[in-house]
Amino acid sequence: MSAPHSALQAELDAAQSPYLAFRGIGKSFPGVLALDDISFTCQAGQIHALMGENGAGKSTLLKILSGNYTPTQGEIHIKGKAVNFTNTTDALDAGVAIIYQELHLVPEMTVAENIYLGQLPTKMGMVDRKLLRYESRIQLSHLGLDIDPDTPLKYLSIGQWQMVEIAKALARNAKIIAFDEPTSSLSAREIEQLFRVIRELRAEGRVILYVSHRMEEIFALSDAITVFKDGRYVRTFDDMTQVNNASLVQAMVGRNLGDIYGYQPREIGSERLTLQAVKAIGVASPISLTVHQGEIVGLFGLVGAGRSELLKGLFGDTKLTSGKLLLDGQPLTIRSPIDAISAGIMLCPEDRKADGIIPVHSVQDNINISARRKTLTAGCLINNRWEADNALLRIQSLNIKTPGPQQLIMNLSGGNQQKAILGRWLSEDMKVILLDEPTRGIDVGAKHEIYNVIYQLAKQGIAVLFASSDLPEVLGLADRIVVMREGAISGELDHEYATEEQALSLAMLRTPNIATNTASAVA
């Protein structure tokens, strides 16, 4: 075969092969096999989702693709040729860019400087500001953004930061762009803009890898889905008409969707927490409801319904402006979180990273931070033995996945951080647990574990009041669903009869119509 013909054949073969291929990728750390023989392919002009529980190996694979990690075994092929990335520069030069959840930008620098960071245009040994602005405007225009390139990044929104990160990738002519949980901090409008840009990048023939726990995003965007479990490849769905929530969950966790909530009936006791015409800051109307011992009550509503504000008021984070609280039939006054904790009322907040954990402290410290006030020695010294034993007990009983009690909690997954917060309150004399978006940002498998913990608390007679914007979660978990709209209760549904249609109808009613029964709640 002649040399020109061989070259032509090689070019044709490359054109017909997948743009990106993972061939037997493995990655080991001391004592841990993070990835085991991962093989799948991605096509140009395709949005390819990666799904799996936390710890399934998605992020590790992206770090190998970006040059942050070197695989223990296997190869990555781009356009039919094996590549070997020993650092991130190698990957960038090969046209690979990763848009991480924690954006890698410099707030004090301008938009233009961030876009061309590491490759600023120069003229006579100086940064060519005119060319920098010109080139930056081209990249921003490509994304449909009207932003002054000279604006310091710190003055932009998180959504705009993300667009700058994408512009930075395009400035390096990235043909493979991976997004790792990109919508976690975005508003609905910013998410819509991001999706528009991602679809445009697909139309340009780029390979898009997309990692998210949010199934609605996966189904809205993806052309194919590859599922990982415990560091291993499970399967690829390349026909989106043949996949649904149930089949995807089954592939991810090995359980049917109905098993995730695993509703557990139990004995409901007497009234534990009673709200009589209670108003809180951000809650427009007086709220009256009761949660019994061993009962799980879910608060559902659309954005602005007042669910989080009510829970914050009950915990003393914000002020209750009127009404009465009863705990086990006795009047209760709550002016601060200390009052609530002393009464046995605990809160797992909506934003666990900002309000629930102390990121730079250990798992042990985060579990013991509340109980510490009761366990100090006579000399006001920390009782290290008790704290170590208590932390180990909570880690084992809640199956918190951590290398050890001294691991920084910021290094744990969202599900394990949430379990550590629950472990903190198990050290208290808990009567009521308030949970605000208890499984937001948590993978399906960890959700199942959180639900089991909630059921166990309820079986111990603890009253559970939780707020969630995940309607299937509310319907699957709660004994009763209290629906709120614009700071008022618009209806109430019983677990046995509640449907998504009823709950959404109540959430969108224009006039509050308090209903106390089952299917008759919505006329």
Curated annotation (Swiss-Prot):
It is found in: Cell inner membrane. GO terms for cellular component: plasma membrane. It catalyses: L-arabinose(out) + ATP + H2O = L-arabinose(in) + ADP + phosphate + H(+). Its EC number is 7.5.2.12. Its main location: membrane. It is a peripheral membrane protein. InterPro entries: AAA+_ATPase, ABC_carbohydrate_import_ATPase, ABC_transporter-like_ATP-bd, ABC_transporter-like_CS, P-loop_NTPase. Gene3D superfamilies: P-loop containing nucleotide triphosphate hydrolases. Residues 20-255, 268-511 form the ABC transporter domain. Keywords: ATP-binding, Cell inner membrane, Cell membrane, Membrane, Nucleotide-binding, Repeat, Sugar transport, Translocase, Transport. ATP binds at G52, E53, N54, G55, A56, G57, K58, S59. It comes from the Bacteria. Pfam families: ABC_tran. One of its GO terms (molecular function) is ATP binding. The complex is composed of two ATP-binding proteins (AraG), two transmembrane proteins (AraH) and a solute-binding protein (AraF). Part of the ABC transporter complex AraFGH involved in arabinose import. Responsible for energy coupling to the transport system. Belongs to the ABC transporter superfamily. Arabinose importer (TC 3.A.1.2.2) family. This is Arabinose import ATP-binding protein AraG. It comes from Yersinia pestis. The lineage of its organism: Bacteria, Pseudomonadati, Pseudomonadota, Gammaproteobacteria, Enterobacterales.
